[in-house]
């Protein structure tokens, strides 16, 4: 089967305007492929107001400053150089991930609505508390369900199996899907806690779909 990757670009100019003054001196610029064509334009706007702008590149990204799916390495790679990040795009999926990974302030500018915001630290704190609670549940549980996907780029079966040697006092059940069906997980009522080895956002965004705690492999 032939695969074609077709980029959907937005051609609308991005003008940050007076919001530039709300940003600290050293800024890491990140965006999605939709606005990658406007990155240089935004960089010039920031530099005109005395800001120092940094780009990074993710493992799976095609361009500098690009975030792609769960990959926010373009931000992580420059986190020690910057005071905060500016995300150009819509939605909170990527900026929330950047905030969690880097512990830095993340400002957002939506070119479609011209709205400028800052990630609320309370939201991040709430997520971190949930993660700590899931870790406590994992450590105190004996029957563990390990969610594994067969999707390219997300499959971590080898790392999942390593849990058996690290936690010999627990029983692990490996549940393999392509697309995870949360209803099917309810067929294993004896499982006390789930470990997610697929997209890390599942444990954050989809935890409400489960009656049991779920923790990402990277958080153990």
What are these regions (language model features)?
Residues 1-130, 177:
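The feature marks the mature, well-folded catalytic cores of soluble enzymes
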Residues 80-91, 185-200:
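Short, well-ordered secondary-structure micro-motifs within conserved domains or adaptor modules
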Residues 94-172, 182-188:
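Redox- and metal-dependent alpha/beta enzyme cores, enriched for Fe-S-associated oxidoreductases
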Residues 1-5, 51, 103-105, 172, ...:
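Active-site regions of enzymes building and remodeling cell-envelope glycoconjugates
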Residues 112-116, 121, 200-220:
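Peripheral docking tails and interdomain loops at the edges
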Residues 175-179, 193-196:
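A conserved acidic, glycine/proline-rich C-terminal tail/linker
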Residues 4, 26-33, 54, 143-151, ...:
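Short glycine-rich or small-residue beta-strand-to-loop segments that form or flank ligand, phosphate
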Residues 90-93, 151-152, 199-202, 220:
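Short glycine-rich anion-binding loops that position phosphate/pyrophosphate groups of nucleotides
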């Amino acid at each position: 089967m032939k695969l074609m990757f077709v980029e959907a670009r937005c051609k609308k100019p991005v003008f940050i305007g007076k919001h530039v003054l709300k940003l600290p001196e050293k800024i890491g610029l990140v965006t999605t492929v939709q606005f990658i064509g406007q990155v240089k334009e935004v960089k010039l706007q920031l530099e005109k107001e005395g800001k120092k702008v940094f780009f990074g590149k993710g493992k799976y990204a095609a361009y500098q400053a690009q975030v792609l799916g769960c990959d926010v390495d373009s931000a992580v790679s420059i986190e020690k150089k910057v005071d905060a990040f500016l995300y150009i795009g819509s939605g909170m999926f990527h900026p929330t991930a950047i905030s969690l990974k880097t512990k830095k302030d993340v400002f957002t500018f939506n070119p479609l609505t011209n709205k400028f915001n800052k990630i609320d630290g309370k939201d991040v704190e709430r997520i971190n508390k949930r993660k700590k609670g899931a870790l406590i549940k994992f450590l105190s549980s004996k029957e563990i369900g390990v969610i594994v996907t067969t999707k390219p780029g997300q499959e971590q079966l080898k790392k999942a199996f390593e849990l058996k040697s690290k936690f010999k006092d627990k029983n692990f059940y490996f549940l393999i899907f392509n697309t995870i069906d949360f209803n099917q997980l309810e067929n294993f009522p004896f499982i006390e806690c789930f470990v997610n080895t697929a997209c890390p956002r599942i444990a954050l965004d989809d935890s409400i779909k489960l009656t049991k705690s779920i923790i990402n492999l990277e958080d153990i």
